[in-house]
Amino acid sequence: MGTTRAPWHTPPRSSPMTIAFDAPAADALARDSELLSAVLHEVLVEQNGAALAREVRWLHEAAAELRAGDPAADRVLVERVAALPDEQVEPVIRACALQLQLANIAEERERVRRRREYDRTGARQRESLLEAAELLRRDGADLAAAVRALHVELVLTAHPTEATRKSVLDHQLHIARMLDGLDDPRIGATDRRRLLADLRESLTLWWLTDEVRRVRPKVEDEVRRNLFFFTHTLHEAVPQVLDELERTFGVRVGGRALTFGSWAGSDMDGHPEVGAEMLSRTLSLHRTAALRLLRGGVDALAARFSHSRRHVTVSPALEASLARDEAELPTAEVLRRVHREWEPLRTKLGFVAHRLSNMLDPVAREPGYADPQELRADLWLVLDSLGSPNVARGAIRRLLRQVEVFGFHVAALDVRQSAAVVQEAVAALLPGYRQAGEEEQAQLLAEAIAEDRRGLDRRPEGAAGELLRVLDTVAIAREAFGPAAVPVMVISMVHAPSDVLAALWLTRRAGARLRLVPLFETLADLEGAPATMATLYGTPVYRDSLRAEGDRQTIMLGYSDSGKDSGFVSSQWALHVAQERLAAQAAERELELELFHGRGGSPSRGGGRTHRAILAQPRGSLSGRIRITEQGETVSARYGDPELAVRSLEQTLSAVLLASAREQPPVPGAWRAEMERMSERSRAIYRALVYEDPDFPRFFAQVTPIEELTALNIGSRPSKRSAGGVEALRAIPWVFAWTQSRVLLPSWYGAGAALAEGPLELQREMAARWPFFQSILSSLEMALYKADLGVGERYLRLVEPELAERFWPRIEREYAQVVGRVLEITGASALLDDAPALQRRLSHRNPWVDPLSHLQVELLARARAGREDAREPLLETITGIAAGLRNTG
């Protein structure tokens, strides 16, 4: 039986040089896919021989025939996988995985192409700043007020299951640039040959690079990985998107509209390698990266700004500044230039560069800048003397934007530690604390905070002692680098007011006045969050601390653990209700509330379309301010290319502007009651399977590669908080394991009966008019479409028959019920019917992902039988499937 071929199928139909680069724009994705496939085919033949390329083709064709409905192809696929010679197993896996990653690159170039076309024609792109401005004008909103209130902070995390090495990211970025060059219709045959040769070279180097790390990454590797995105793409993208915001809304946009944070190197929670030394090292790496970028930007300006005194008017302030620089910087290279007297702007920029260099030199005797404001003041002196508005809006404005947003630290570091460790530190230091109950502990802490003493009499051992050393480092760093470098302490797993008051006391005693952010993660803690905050707001010393922060309270909401606790639907509703109550509570007290969303990549951890998720926030919970985590697994997809980064940033900013400035109607009581019912029912179904059946942990361990994941060197953090089963497992590897087996159970299980038992017409009304419910259905559709229980069933050969017979039928029934009900509500004939392009892309991936899944099952069987040679190729399948589904945890 025939099947529709994916545009990146093997073997290629033509050689790279014969591909039509002048094809219509509509065919550009197919052209890029064909080109990448053709070049990979050449690389495979050159590096490993034609036999490997043939084997890859046969596996792909068998998987495609099976997808097209040919049952005989199933046997062929199974037999070919089992019969693969040992020496071909790993190369075949790598070839399939590389095809999938090349598909990702081709699709990303298509996104860039579409954005450019909208920009060229002036047409309005969905989820753009232009669309947001038009919608707000139509509603009569105050655009200037909306922009002035805007403050979006994106916090990059180090993801425990991020599967892409930085070396691979470099190759991917280079290949994307080659495709971009080939897209230019003006290039001739010589340039095309050169670009194709570069493309072939990059792909060969990638093929010869280990996809899987041979050793577990150090924390510093994760710090450098985050810095890669800041220095390679975001540094370029941010000025563009802020300029676009200013141009579209006609309002001056300051640097506070968009800022960045990072957890890599400062997140201590469950991470023994992160401590005072690592924090200090991270601060140094951030500062060095920021200063080098700024120095490079200033050097580039100096090379261009050759203005003569005869053609520009030098302001008295700039003249005075030059005189001061000459006195303070006698060794500056610019003083040796012949033309310095006649080129004042270039001379000034030379002094600026020298000051930045001094800041990079630990033994420099001449001054640098005390803070970014001093640098901005010098750049404004140059700007004021330019005279030309065209130049003023160009390179120097971009540099000023970069100084505003990234400062001397690139991204603010959040210190994070669990409430349990914070409490342990206090118990070791405060007499009588350990024996007291919650109310008495809160009272003891309030009294101790009111004393306002500095210094600590003694130091506990272990994690508690390391926390105190970190706080000492923070106090020093804030003095040296400014408060913006380390502004926040996130207290994870907050259960009670004393958890936050304990952190307040510790930070005060250590002299580190950090903004405290309680993180509510479990379902019970989310439900109890308003009561916890009410107690804190009623505690005078805590209220005084908020007053010192401008009456601003930041609260973080954890999507991961609540989803693992209660399932997707119940978790989403609990988060929604918590936000409503916390927002109302803050408004009553005239506090400015900033919600910090700990979203992940998968739907079960709050992932999905960022724009839609922001629009689904409850009424009154957004007032222009929001913090959002960008998990390691999604960062490369959203920010791996400067133009993709611009698009991702504008989608986030436009959603926050719309959600903040547009009036939202109250949610009808019937809708709330239905969501409450669905939440309770889905939670009961989910927990009955995951937590209440004592045999489920054994089934989970056998039907997914969870045990093998712990051997994969893709994150520095341990996958478990403590010894134990599902309860002890972190939410991220829990989701990753189910993604690998293609079941994606955490993203949909429990929703079937919960939806099916409710009134269909009411649910259709909710789907038509309520953004929150639309977001739930959208996330369910995506997860259900990516899930494949036919492939997941293959993993049952690894499971004890009795366990398979008990659990698999329950999973199949629930899946069928969820799919059926979602289609009934939406009125569609198939999942993702309203997104045919996405449907096609995901469907075209399956014939490459399926062989990887079959190979993974075979290799898991071998590994569990004790075959050591199965380990390396098994880990390759894990990274390949993650790339194919574009999901880890």
Indicate residue ranges for each PLM-predicted region:
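Structured alpha-helical segments in the cores of large, soluble enzyme domains
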Residues: 153-159, 164-165, 169-176, 189-210, ...
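Catalytic or ion-translocation cores adjacent to nucleophile or general acid/base/metal-coordination motifs
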Residues: 274-303, 509-684
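Active-site cores of enzymes that catalyze phosphoryl transfer or operate on phosphate-rich substrates
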Residues: 341-347, 351-354, 358, 408-501, ...
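Often metal-dependent polyanion-binding catalytic scaffolds in large enzymes
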Residues: 12-446, 463-466, 514, 607, ...
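Carbohydrate-active enzymes and regulators
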Residues: 43, 58, 71, 108, ...
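C-terminal accessory/interaction regions of large nucleic acid-associated machines
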Residues: 700-889
